[in-house]
């Protein structure tokens, strides 16, 4: 049964401490502080129940991320106009919600949570479990660069023999078609071009985007409509995104420290 970091004690949010008895901030039912010598201190519903189906069992990854934010932002009860209630992992005073996802999730639940929390929401996903299935490949230019509108980049083919992280970075191994390559009758020629023909344009217009191959992808993160950031465990994190007019699935390098600082400063997520 999922545990809680926060319960209400005499109507005020409180962390667990020995001997305390409080109330669940979502449903108002009794909550008991669990403060043993082995597990971290936490709150639990009295009896075998939990009132929020979106909460998951938490491990070290989940707790470490929560601890980066002020206690007042952690496990905040949220309500919508219809009376539906859920507990956001992290919610800033300005309404920005940060959901920390460790376990697999259905597309239906993802869509429900995005609809509930609205557009000001960030998914931070523990991607260490499927890190070996993602190959980060060649760099892409800024999708907003003028010359990119003419290009149709070719997505690499998944190969289980090369499912490790390979970051090249200069664009030379890219392959693409040009929309402007047409026959006199207007039909596309489908002439394939090499990234070498772009010279230094990729390096000069690089803002973190990379092609990637994802073996056995978790489709839920390809279909999410809010910001999704994969945590592989290091300083570099990766935004899961769609590139250009063709919406080619790719990843974008994100600085973990800059992302966290922007969220703490009350700003939009720094990417």
Model-derived segments and spans:
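Non-catalytic C-terminal interaction segments of nucleic acid-processing enzymes
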Residues: 1-19, 129-271
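Nuclease-adjacent, charged terminal/linker segments that flank catalytic cores
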Residues: 1-74, 80, 255-271
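Active-site metal-binding core of divalent-cation-utilizing nuclease and nuclease-like domains
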Residues: 15-18, 28-34, 61-112, 129-141
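Short hydrophobic alpha-helical runs that function as membrane-insertion/retention elements
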Residues: 120-125
